[in-house]
Amino acid sequence: MTIFGTSLFIMTMENTSTDKIISIHQAQKEYFRSGETLCLCFRKKMLKKLLEAMEKWESKLADALWTDLHKSYEEAYLTEISIVTGEIRNHIRNVGKWARRKRAHSPLKLFPSRSYVVKEPLGNVLIVSPWNYPVQLLLNPLVGAISAGCTAVLKPSPYVPTVSKVIEDMIAETFEERYIAVMQGNRHVNAALFEQRWDMIFFTGSPALAKTVMEAAAKNLTPVVLELGGKSPCIIDKAADIAVAAKRIAWGKTLNSGQTCIAPDYILIHKDVKEAFVKAFAAEVRNLHGEDIRKDRHYVRMVNDKAFERVTGYFKDGNIIYGGRTDAESRFIEPTLIENVALDSPLMTEEIFGPVFPVITIDDNGTILSPCHSESSPCHPEFSQCHPEPSQCHPERSEGSFLQSVITFVTSREKPLAFYYFGKESDGWDVIRRTSSGGGCINDVIMHIANENVPFGGVGNSGMGRYHDKASFEAFSHTRSIIATGTWIDLPFRYMPYKMFVLVKKIL
């Protein structure tokens, strides 16, 4: 058993049997066909039940997050529990408006018809979530499924077994299995779930696993929402307020110890402010977490040994200029800045999902300074005392200015889930206009997800579909176009043999 108990729980957690998966899937389909979930009063009642359950189980959820992730109560509440309860309250207030049949304009050629847009639930849905925000990323989509009128199967991650078990118990106490149920287990359980014919699959995870989900969904033409990740760039221009940038970036990168799908992944920084930023970043990490970050209860650990080994493995891809301390027993990794990184190294091609930050320096002319080539022998990662020989590193040039180099760099890679720019707001809008990402911030990081009034989602390799607020309701709904035509008059021009075609052609 590890310090947080994860290994023991993974060995003893019972996988949901295939027979039970099939049975519950069929029961939920039959329950949906009964029409009970369609009633707006039923949906509101179920949302209120979920809200009451969240409030009742809050302390158990927070304790479980501490056990699995070393996530403090404050961070658990702010980044997980309160986001779900806030979403529930928002849906209770607005689902009546969202679900209402809406009148649409009818052109003259449809006279005497009335046109409507009608929302209907997609049906029986599957929601699969990852381990990094195991409460928020499983239950937030569920809110949309309930408000839309769907039945749902929830599949939490086996890597956070304590949280997954608490959620299973909470859902079982709150809802009937024929309405909402939780399935537990490993990839074999996932495979059995994906074999079923769902009316929609909502998946949060990696792009690699998303391809498996899409392949399974394609067999039945099942629609999907994919909330993925990627390498979200953080640009620091020379006009940036370095003190503010360092504080916000340090917070965003250490939140959940960098295990956030929209965490800033790598830094593209103007050479004139690079040294000042490194010093300010180090100071802000100390301000946030104290002189000995290992003693800070707000600093989250890596989810398991595999994640710890993967993230610390990135240290060899460059030279550490800040941080670098680790503790394998507790899976602690200090916030770490690394420079002289090969642009084709794993550190610059894989989503980091940890508190390690590659720093790429660019000058006024758009020259990327000193990126090591992957074929050269890597320097030993021993803090800032290690510097590569000049023969090992060579500058790369991108024509034009700093901003043009940034744009070229970002657009040459997969579209990220988030994009962050620090500098003049006008320049930020220019860079955003010429790049593509799921969302982003100017002079901030991560906070775009905190506004429940705007949708959240990826683009390209970082995902498809949107949720949060009305977008969650829309994600689990089908939009129908309905025309109701009066019978008191029947205009003849649409009927064969089109005797009025000349007149109709002039009108149309």
Model-found features: residue ranges?
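Hydrophobic packing residues within well-ordered alpha-helices of enzyme cores
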Residues: 164-167, 193, 213, 277, ...
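N-terminal Rossmann-like NAD(P)+-binding subdomain of aldehyde/semialdehyde dehydrogenases
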Residues: 9-116
